[in-house]
Design a protein with these regions (language model features):
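Primarily recognizes Gram-negative and organellar outer-membrane beta-barrels
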Residues: 1-200
Length: 200
């Protein structure tokens, strides 16, 4: 048997603060997932040459859990003559957890509460990503262009464990810096030229 649920949502807000083009924007999104499955594993294998039996009697529980969310904020400041300065920041986090725990019966009570470490395996992965950017945008009658710079810190962690025993725990931190260039030219209503570069 098993059960689970999956939920997600998104909230957006944007407000123009004056007639010149000052704009504040904000968004928040996220989701969560949680499910489980129960399984019975019973087998009795007889090895004739070795004259022995191998009995496997287990109740296995599978759990899969995850969540994620992202927050974003943007500020656009008009500089005059159809020129704008934009600052943005985003923060996102994601975590995934997959558990497989096998239990054998207690010899005294018969309840399946003894963890079988040979058949159990659990892992958890976590990710955090950020981006801060500052850009200049110019709008003209036939064309517009944007020149900016991004800073992208990120963090990841991967854990492998059985019960309370940690088998491996690896983490990594990285910071990337990248330029950004965008150029759009409108020849007519049907024809546009677009150039975009996001360096890494």
């Amino acid at each position: 048997d098993g059960s689970g649920y999956n939920l997600s949502g998104r909230l957006e807000f944007s407000r123009k603060l004056n007639s010149k083009g000052r704009v504040l924007s904000f968004s928040l999104s996220g989701g969560v997932n949680d499910s489980y499955t129960n399984e019975v594993n019973y087998s009795n294998t007889e090895y004739l040459q070795e004259q022995r039996n191998e009995l496997v009697d287990q109740h296995i529980r599978y759990d899969n859990k995850s969540y994620n969310y992202r927050a974003y904020i943007s500020w656009v400041e008009p500089l005059g003559h159809n020129n704008f300065l934009q600052a943005t920041y985003s923060f996102s986090q994601q975590q995934q957890e997959s558990l497989k725990n096998a239990y054998t019966p207690d010899l005294e009570t018969g309840e399946y509460n003894v963890l079988d470490t040979a058949y159990s395996k659990n892992y958890r992965n976590s990710y955090i990503n950020q981006r801060a950017s500052l850009s200049f945008k110019a709008q003209r009658e036939k064309y517009n262009y944007t020149i900016g710079f991004n800073v992208d810190p990120s963090y990841s962690r991967s854990e492998n464990f059985i019960g309370d025993t940690v088998l491996s725990d690896l983490s990594r931190k990285v910071v990337n810096f990248s330029p950004m260039i965008r150029f759009n030219y409108r020849f007519n209503k049907q024809t546009n030229l677009r150039i975009r570069y996001d360096g890494r």
